[in-house]
Curated annotation (Swiss-Prot):
It is an enzyme of class 6 (ligase). PROSITE patterns: TTL. PANTHER family: TUBULIN--TYROSINE LIGASE. SUPFAM superfamilies: Glutathione synthetase ATP-binding domain-like. This is Tubulin--tyrosine ligase. The gene is TTL.
């Protein structure tokens, strides 16, 4: 009998994983403070990593990688892409971005002496001078000059401003209490018809204890309810596809898709009929490349291969597609929620791939090693 503890009662994904484990009859749930467990389904931000792997004779597995915030916080992701040897020169799939600290945090400002591609040496270096250099050059060249400011730890569409005025963006950040990222706004996105609407794409990615990377075959488009336009960047419902913003502010929420969600099968049909292309050939190949590039760049820093405990983690990668069908990474979520209709399959995959590979069912010795569930693709 294996044992597990649950330290995050708010995760709907791990509530389902917990239910699936108990249903096998091979797992027993312990009190959250019991130190002698096989599996910890923990909270993302306060996991006691230092206490893991010290129980004699007990293999321990936890559902997060220590240090994964290098990918999952917006400012850290920008720094990673600019400083990682694997990404710095070859990354063409991430919008031009700058890390900006509010002036009240008294963070050193990096002088813009190396053009617009700053080498970030300090963990807290403000890049506003580099941003202004790039902004002014685009203005002189007559290029599109719309940017989006996003709180590094923000979620659900909070802490966001879209503007073509540099002073407005910087003033907005300076009145906040935390680091932000200023990122080039994708002004010509691929739009859905009917409705001339924006969308983004959420893909779920599972990394197991051996750092094998699995992409969940199903994904979801989170769609806007209102027609896209560039006349008013304060109109959240046409620019931001966050579920909570669409539901709260748009009278057309649910008009085109139930819950403003379109799944991959329907999206593939749309691409085939409207553009004579397939999802796999035009978009998914790019998504797979970006996911592998990101996760492999942080592997040396977060892998648990030589530690006394093991980790796995579910990630949510968010993408946008421009009118030229180029895929752009927007952000990575380290504790993603899941569309309701996908819970059962996604969570069963977590059990089969990430947990049963470390703690096999008692009858597994009589069975040959099973391939990953068909719902997941090993990258």
């Amino acid at each position: 009998m294996y044992t597990f503890v649950v330290r995050d009662e708010n995760s709907s994904v791990y509530a389902e994983v917990s239910r699936l484990l108990l249903a096998t009859g091979h797992w027993k749930r312990l009190r959250r403070d019991n130190p002698r467990f096989n599996l910890m389904l923990g909270e993302r931000n306060r996991l006691p990593f230092g206490r893991l792997g010290h129980e004699p004779g007990l293999m321990q597995l936890v559902n997060y990688y220590r240090g994964a915030d290098k990918l999952c916080r917006k400012a850290s992701l920008v720094k990673l892409i600019k400083t990682s040897p694997e990404l710095a020169e070859s990354c063409t799939w991430f919008p031009e971005s700058y890390v900006i600290y509010p002036t009240n945090l008294k963070t050193p400002v990096a002088p813009a002496q190396n053009g617009i591609h700053p080498p970030i040496h300090s963990s807290r270096t403000d890049e506003r001078e580099f941003f202004l250099t790039s902004y002014n050059k685009k203005k002189e060249d007559g290029e599109g000059n719309v940017w989006i400011a996003k709180s590094s730890a923000g979620a659900k569409g909070e802490g966001i401003l879209i503007s073509s005025e540099a002073t407005e963006l910087l003033d907005f950040i300076d009145n906040q209490g935390q680091v932000h990222v200023i990122q080039k706004y994708l002004e010509r996105p691929l739009l859905l018809e009917p409705g001339h609407r924006k969308f983004d794409i959420r893909s779920w990615v599972l990394v197991d204890h051996q750092y094998n990377i699995y992409l969940y075959r199903e994904g979801v488009l989170r769609t806007a309810s209102e027609p896209y336009h560039t006349d008013n960047f304060q109109d959240k419902t046409c620019h931001l596809t966050n579920h909570c913003i669409q539901k709260e502010y748009s009278k057309n929420y649910g008009k085109y898709e139930e819950g403003n969600e379109m799944f991959f099968e329907e999206f593939n049909q749309y691409l085939t009929s409207a553009l004579n292309i397939t999802l796999e050939s035009s978009i998914l190949l790019q998504i797979k490349h970006i996911i592998r590039s990101c996760l492999l760049s942080v592997e040396p820093a977060i892998s648990t291969r030589h530690l006394p405990y093991q980790s796995f983690q579910l990630f949510g990668f968010d993408f946008m597609v421009d009118e030229d069908l180029k895929v752009w990474l927007i952000e990575v979520n380290g504790a993603p929620a899941c569309a309701q209709k996908l819970y059962a399959e996604l969570c069963q995959g977590i059990v089969d791939i990430a947990i049963a590979s470390v703690f096999p069912p008692p009858d597994a010795e009589q069975q040959q090693q099973q391939p990953p569930p068909a719902a997941f693709i090993k990258l």
